[in-house]
């Protein structure tokens, strides 16, 4: 009897041990399942996000590299939109302007008294973050961590003519899926090099590149004679009437600063943001007029039509809360607008650094960040933008290509911002807002890609203020004060300009695109008469498009003319 009890006890002990062992294995699988199944990679889930926002990230070995400024591009806009030039930052160039750089470092180190009446001193003081105080923005080396992530991009993205033809066709058919599918876009999935946005040094370095685009450039009399700039667009020769035009940092245009890695394999394009009076920390007033025009075109509901007292940037407004969608889309793709300028800038960069053999990233602050996002979506480039206004509306109006069913976390577009910045949060509008008083109609709030937001209102008790939009504030007082980078999540459901009605020519037409078709000749305008059972056909001549050439101070048009007379 005793031995029988011992056997039963032994069986019970073995059964209990088996249960404990099984439970232990189960717990290991529950809390660390992927390491046991996939020892070569780690899949991480971002907890705390809604299911549709959870991102599965496959981490792979990361590399480090240092980046340095190699080129500056300037693309003209407005009446000078055909001008495009490049400045190479060579040792000879740095030696030539050594005195200016030493003076700049003295300003940053605080050894020289800065007068609030001296605009140059104030701009220099605010253009460069304190984190890099004493460092030369033209020779600084910026460390970054490079990661690998999957991406879905157009196979023909290296063919600029193909991209142009697609954008024109997509605009003509309003991105109608039935017709876009006929193009048979070919998407390819591949692992690409991207900036590691979870590494604080990398986020700071990219923000520094965005800040670098604001730094003033040394100019002298030789500079006005185009001694250092290389024409990559339409040549320009000074004459007696135009011998004082300043290029590179002139009154019209878009700037891009090109940083290149040590191994010459990775290129970062830093797009300059808004320069203008009334926006603190946005640089000098060098490109104020065109920056404001493009800001109001990209981020307003209808050409910056806020009230009858505003001068609109285009003639698409029809009546109260009604706007012509076709007109808006044509304005965005005009050759003298910034979207075309940033496309041309990218194409000239790829002449030196071909996209087939180089990894190209884009970054920018404010307007520069939004343009970086539009460029990245057009060509499938990784983008890190800082404090950019909502660019989703512009993306839709431009009908940019997007892989079907691709989740936002796979787009490789990251928007960094803070909750105390009214421009990034989309609340810098209304009659009493600072943006409105400065002449900016920033009415959009929706972003594409992922949003990485520092909640400084909750964490630090900050108040919403336009001063928190400055790039050096973002670097010195936000990113550098947090141990980790901001968590990234999808944009919640968002719609801009919901109270506006947008009209289009295809509202009353069939869905067939009005493209040349040899099998279906165009229909002439006809007038029929029932008398004598005869009909006559007359072709009416379409009138040339006209636009407003001159307005009164309260917005009433007093002079109309042809498009080319503007």
UniProtKB/Swiss-Prot annotation:
Biased composition regions of type Low complexity, renumbered to the chain: 522-543
Hydrolase recorded as keyword: yes
Positions of the catalytic residues: 366 (charge relay system)
EC main group: hydrolase
One Pfam family linked to the record: Lipase_3
PROSITE patterns: LIPASE_SER
Glycosylation sites: 264, 348, 483
Example of a GO biological process term: piecemeal microautophagy of the nucleus
Keywords attached to this entry: Autophagy, Endosome, Glycoprotein, Hydrolase, Lipid degradation, Lipid metabolism, Membrane, Signal-anchor, Transmembrane, Transmembrane helix
GO cellular component: multivesicular body membrane; vacuolar lumen
Reactions this protein catalyses: a triacylglycerol + H2O = a diacylglycerol + a fatty acid + H(+)
Lumenal-side segments: 39-566
Start and end residues of each stretch annotated as Disordered: 507-545
CDD domains: Lipase_3
Signal peptide from the UniProt entry: none
Topological region Cytoplasmic: 1-17
GO molecular function: phospholipase activity; triacylglycerol lipase activity
Membrane topology type: Single-pass type II membrane protein
Transmembrane segments: 18-38
EC number: 3.1.1.3
Function: Lipase which is essential for lysis of subvacuolar cytoplasm to vacuole targeted bodies and intravacuolar autophagic bodies. Involved in the lysis of intravacuolar multivesicular body (MVB) vesicles. The intravacuolar membrane disintegration by ATG15 is critical to life span extension.
Assembly and oligomerization: Binds to both phosphatidylinositol (PI) and phosphatidylinositol 3,5-bisphosphate (PIP2).
The family this protein is said to belong to: Belongs to the AB hydrolase superfamily. Lipase family.
Protein name (database record): Putative lipase ATG15
Species whose genome carries this gene: Meyerozyma guilliermondii (strain ATCC 6260 / CBS 566 / DSM 6381 / JCM 1539 / NBRC 10279 / NRRL Y-324)
